[in-house]
From Swiss-Prot:
Its EC number is 3.5.1.88. The keyword Transferase does not apply. The active site is at residue 172. The gene is def1. This is Peptide deformylase 1. InterPro entries: Peptide_deformylase, Peptide_deformylase_sf. One of its GO terms (biological process) is translation. Keywords: Hydrolase, Iron, Metal-binding, Protein biosynthesis. Fe cation binds at residues 129, 171, 175. Signal peptide: none annotated. It comes from Bifidobacterium longum (strain NCC 2705).
Length: 217
């Protein structure tokens, strides 16, 4: 459980309830875009500031918003809320032939997440962000990490993640520190989603894009 002395922040709880209501019956919240100050602010650690009921509603609304976008992760900052929590989920078939090492990543609520690399191996692939809508860029990330987080019940988790699930976890955790993926991306690789589909999707390894657009892998 979260801290024994944790108390619900009544003002914050009311604000979050109002935020949830803006999603309507569809439970769809607007996703804030790059340039909004909240995306650049370090979040406050979650320690029970919301009632269990409000937290459950927030998680449900974030999950619905993420899936509808569609995306595989959504941080609280992306809906304008400066708390250290995010939701992640990617239902894909494991593909041993895909160099991105894509694998099933079941739904998780990750609260106060952190990660550490467990090897010096990195991988560079295109990735995108719901708060930098319409574009993707090549970002180098750790291939293997130890991921740590609390779930919605306050239980602590520590698990190894590899490949694409590790990339998703790093992306969402970085959001909660005020970082966007584009901050450390290969800027010359930046492309619209349409151009990515037209030019660079045939091979997930962006070797040709690096040669044509002039960036290093």
């Amino acid at each position: 459980m979260f801290g024994k002395n944790a108390k619900v922040d009544l003002e914050l709880n009311r604000d979050v309830e109002q935020l949830i209501k803006t999603g309507g019956k569809e439970k769809l919240l607007p996703i804030v875009q790059a340039g909004e100050p909240v995306l650049r602010q370090r979040t406050v650690a979650y320690n029970g500031q919301l009632s269990k009921r409000t937290l459950a509603k927030l998680i449900d609304t974030m999950h619905t918003t993420m899936l509808e976008a569609p995306g595989v992760g959504l941080a609280a900052t992306q809906i304008g809320l400066g708390l250290a929590l995010a939701v992640v989920e990617d239902h894909v078939r494991d593909d041993e032939d895909d160099p991105r090492e894509i694998a099933e990543f079941p739904f998780h609520v990750i609260i106060n997440p952190s990660y550490k690399p467990t090897s010096d191996k990195t991988a560079s692939f295109y990735e995108g962000c719901l708060s930098f809508d319409g574009y993707q860029a090549v970002r180098k990330r750790w291939l293997d990490i130890t991921a740590e987080w609390d779930d919605e019940d306050g239980k602590h988790h520590s698990e190894p993640l590899h490949g694409w699930p590790a990339r998703i976890f790093q992306h969402e955790t970085d959001h909660l520190s005020g970082e966007l993926y584009i901050d450390r991306a290969e800027i010359r690789s930046l492309t619209t989603n349409e151009n990515l589909e037209d030019y660079w999707c045939e091979d997930p390894v962006p070797t040709e894009a690096a040669e044509e657009l002039g960036f290093a892998l």
